[in-house]
Regions:
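Structured, non-catalytic alpha/beta "coupling" segments that mediate domain-domain communication
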Residues: 3-36, 315, 550-559, 565, ...
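Extended Lys/Arg-rich polyanion-binding regions
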Residues: 412-414, 420-434, 445, 450, ...
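Short cysteine clusters
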Residues: 738-747
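Cys/His-rich metal-chelating microdomains
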Residues: 750
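Long, intrinsically disordered low-complexity tandem-repeat segments
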Residues: 784, 790, 808-814, 828-833, ...
């Protein structure tokens, strides 16, 4: 069956969408509303080739020629030349641009030129590593012996890999847990290590990126111990400042290759907004048809049309739901196609994943609902269409996912289906924010003390730390952490360096937030189903929570926090659960500020107390709220970074916001700001939290806070401070553009609000944000010498606006004294060594609302990244 052209496919989908709206599900509007808000035609481009480098061995060139590569693209040769010359390089080009050849060419050439040389390849997902291993095996170059070393590798094969493989494909987890602690057994491999390849390096962001940066510094240190200094070759999606991001990740100078020479077919890219339904939501809000239900219908229509389609969803559960729904629909309209639809996600057995990948490659499958495990690099050729069930969090991921279709210069269709949240609403009504702005820079902090502490302990257990090592890990920032570890008795100073003091190996969870993971156990059989990160357990495996494991649904009966065990029973409910939290926040210190008259914008350190207090049950499909159940779980403490602004009561009154309206206005503005921060920072709304209050005791004014949901901060709040005008203007526009009357999940309601989304004042939130934006704009327009701003270094950022000239304050809030409290440190998490803080007390303020950051990512990794690895990660 030949698929119709992209424009024809889109016309069919639009007709179906109008028919659905005509059923009357969108009251008070055109009965035949068009769900497509914008169509962008991304043009095709010609490819540009280069001759093979003179140093490339004939067998390597012939092997690539055998796979249809007569001449490489220019960016492939540019990157390969730099790597071959001994310079670390990042190649940041578009999806399907052939980045793999850019590192395969120098690596394989080196392995053939020196029969003792070795290479290490790091992948964020198992699917991508398996795809690369398949390619390397098919090249069949003599003596290379590529091998996988991950959680799927049988124990009896690992010894062979260590002793004989010259090109090991693994992931950061296995380097951290398997290779570095056992470096003596890997000595032969490491002393001959020529190249380290880091594929899809843009996925290493936030706290997870900081962990990977520490693992790579530990790897460099161990390699140096054996006399090796490998060249790093990084492959990245098109991102802003790839050179800077790569250097922060690996800690060495890196050259960037960004001139993409590959051909590209045209893409018809549609922005799709499901219709608003009846007012069945919280507080009588209208409920928009879910992106999952809409995606299932679109995938059904495309499969019936003969279009090979990949639908990207945000969770493992959603992948199963979409695939099941599509098969059920096909049973009615085209039963012969029902078995040509499947789900693909992490958590499947290795054999199941490999079988699905083969079925995708040979065309046996027409439709696949996948998590982002298939986003990264897997060679799925010949696809006609891609559906994105919600904005994936970053433009880099959006272009990665949409680029899965139309590979090899084929024309393709891509459809972004908006979820019921402020960011998606903003994007489908502001297409320039999708198609007219550069891709984000990757945000990570390699000297986050909460990350450095555990890794410095791991490094000291591998080899005693020296002063040179402290410089490697971050200089003065690392030295402060080392001193704290010595004070805690975890490290001991000796003339030769710092030593790990315990006989047991230190632990560091590079994908979690610290603490022991919670084991999920089937109550009737005692079978271990999986684990959940400690930081996510209160929100994901609380009593009554729905837990999904490999397509099977369970309900949590009991959560034992002392034993870190959640007992579950098999059940098939027609509802989902959503935890709700409340927050208390204390300002510890302010590091950067912008004084804008009645408005003051600040960045600082805060202490947050979070508590899961209840959960909602929502009927599926549909999303209607069934009930809310209270929970009795302990509060958790977090020291992190927040961006916040205050507004004087006089300015609020002048803007038409009475004192009684302030809580609802601030609460609504906070919710929307959380939803829109991913527009300027590489984060997910579940990575951040917020609080708004009509009078905060630490500021003495109405205040809106947005904070990083990770100990020590992850760089997201800092990015919000730097791009405050861009961020808050988008927030204001998203609220204003929403078609509801008084607020809904598409604009100001939050799925994790512990105050029941009450009070919320949509109209007054727009007035509040207008006031803040006018004040910040006046500072920018009237700035002469930076007299209005303090904090941060004077570095040029294209969209930082007023934050460009700030200088560090290094101080605390005027008149605020901090009591010294208990000090704690942890090798697996907790506060950084030497961190003294007072006990958190309730503020007693009129808190308008709060939204607690959570870790709702499948696999416990960073937002949007499926766990790749060593095993032992969450499976739900």
């Amino acid at each position: 069956m030949t698929s119709p052209a992209p424009d024809v496919l889109l016309a069919r989908l639009r007709a179906t969408g109008r028919a659905f709206s005509a059923l009357g599900d969108q009251p008070g509007s055109d009965e035949a509303a068009d769900p497509v808000t914008h169509v962008e035609h991304v043009p095709a481009c010609e490819g540009r080739t280069s001759p093979w480098p003179s140093w490339a061995p004939v067998p390597v060139v012939d092997a690539f020629a055998g796979r249809g590569v007569a001449r490489p693209w220019v960016h492939q040769v540019d990157a390969a030349e730099l790597a071959w010359s001994g310079r670390s390089v990042v190649v940041a080009t578009g999806t399907a641009s052939g980045k793999s050849l850019a590192y395969q060419l120098p690596v394989l050439s080196a392995l053939l030129a020196d029969d003792r040389a070795t290479a290490l390849y790091l992948s964020p997902t198992k699917a991508l590593a398996a795809d690369q291993l398949r390619t390397l095996t098919e090249l069949a170059l003599p003596g290379v012996r590529p091998s996988a070393y991950d959680g799927d590798t049988p124990l009896d094969e690992r010894d062979w890999v260590r002793a004989h493989s010259r090109f090991v494909l693994t992931n950061p987890d296995m380097v951290h847990r398997g290779i570095l602690p056992n470096h003596a057994r890997w000595a032969s491999f490491l002393r001959r290590l020529r190249f380290v390849v880091i594929d899809e390096c843009h996925t290493y962001r936030g706290v997870f990126g900081s962990h990977v940066a520490a693992v790579l510094r530990r790897l460099r240190r161990i390699c140096a111990r054996y006399g090796a200094s490998p060249v790093f070759v990084l492959a990245s999606a098109t991102v802003s400042s790839p050179q800077t991001s790569a250097e922060r990740l690996v800690g060495v100078p890196v050259d960037a290759v960004t001139d993409d020479g590959s051909p590209r077919g045209s893409t018809t890219f549609a922005l799709w907004e499901p219709p608003l339904g009846p007012p069945r939501g919280e507080n009588g809000a209208p409920v928009r048809r879910s992106a999952i239900a809409e995606t299932a219908d679109l995938l059904t229509d495309l499969v019936v049309s003969g279009a090979r389609t990949l639908a990207f969803v945000r969770s493992r559960r959603a992948a199963e739901v979409v695939a099941t729904s599509v098969r059920r629909s096909l049973d009615e309209v085209a039963p012969e196609l029902a078995n040509r639809v499947a789900a693909y996600r992490a958590g499947y057995l290795a054999e199941e994943r490999r079988a699905l990948e083969r079925a995708l490659l040979d065309g046996s499958l027409l439709g696949v609902a996948a998590t982002n495990a298939l986003e990264l690099g897997v060679d799925v050729s010949g696809l006609d269409a891609v559906i994105l069930a919600g904005y994936p969090g970053t433009l880099a991921s959006l272009w990665q996912q949409s680029g899965r279709a139309g590979r090899s210069a084929r024309d393709a269709l891509a459809v972004l289906v908006a979820r019921d949240d402020p960011l998606d609403t903003y994007l489908v009504h502001h297409p320039q924010a999708v198609f007219g702005r550069p891709v984000e820079a990757t945000v990570l902090d390699p000297v986050n003390p909460y990350v450095l502490g555990p890794h410095l302990c791991c490094a000291a257990a591998e080899l005693p730390l020296t002063p040179a090592d402290v410089t490697l890990f971050g200089g003065p920032a690392a030295q402060a952490v080392v001193d704290g570890l010595v004070e805690e008795g975890l490290l001991r100073k000796r003339p030769a360096g710092w030593y790990w003091t315990s006989r047991q190996r230190p632990q560091a969870d590079i994908r979690g937030t610290g603490g022991d993971p919670v084991s999920v156990v089937e109550a009737t059989t005692g079978r271990l189903l999986g684990t959940v990160d400690a930081g996510a357990s209160h929100g994901t495996v609380h009593p009554g929570a729905v837990y999904l494991h490999q397509g099977e649904t369970y309900v949590v009966e009991h959560l034992d926090l002392d034993s870190s065990v959640a007992l579950v029973r098999a059940e098939a409910p027609d509802w989902s659960t959503h935890a709700r939290d409340i927050t208390d926040l204390q300002v510890v210190s302010v590091t950067r500020t912008v004084d804008a008259g009645p408005v003051r914008l600040s960045l600082g350190t805060v202490d947050v107390t979070e508590q899961v207090v209840s959960y909602l049950r929502r009927r599926q499909p549909g999303g209607e709220i069934m009930d809310e159940t209270p929970l009795d779980l302990p509060a958790r403490e977090l020291r992190t970074t927040a961006v916040f602004y205050t507004v004087t009561p006089e300015a609020l009154e002048a803007a038409g916001i009475d004192a009684a309206d302030v809580p609802g206005a601030a609460h609504a503005a906070e919710h929307a700001a959380i939803g829109l921060l991913p527009l300027v920072a590489t984060c997910d709304r579940w990575d951040i939290g917020g609080l708004s209050t009509a009078l905060h005791p630490d500021t003495g004014l109405p205040t809106v806070f947005v904070y990083d949901g990770h100990a020590g901060g992850a760089g997201f709040a800092e990015r919000g401070f730097e791009a405050a005008e861009t961020w808050l203007r988008a927030t204001r526009d998203a609220i204003s553009a929403c078609g509801c009357d008084n607020g809904c999940p598409s604009c100001v309601q939050s799925p994790k609000c512990g105050n029941g989304n009450n009070p919320l004042d949509k109209a007054k939130a727009v007035r509040l944000l207008d006031l803040v934006l006018r004040a910040l704009g006046n500072v920018e327009a009237g700035m002469t010498g930076g007299e209005n701003v303090t904090g941060g270094e004077n570095e040029a950022r294209p969209d930082a606006g007023i934050a460009d000239k700030v200088q560090p304050t290094g101080g605390r809030l005027p008149g605020k004294q901090r009591d010294a409290g208990s000090r704690a440190t942890g090798v697996t998490g907790g506060r950084p060594p030497g961190d003294r803080r007072r006990e958190i007390r309730p503020t007693g303020a009129d808190v308008a609302g709060n939204d607690v950051a959570g870790n709702d990512v499948a696999g416990g990794g960073p937002a949007g990244v499926e766990v790749a690895a060593a095993g032992g990660g969450p499976t739900g």
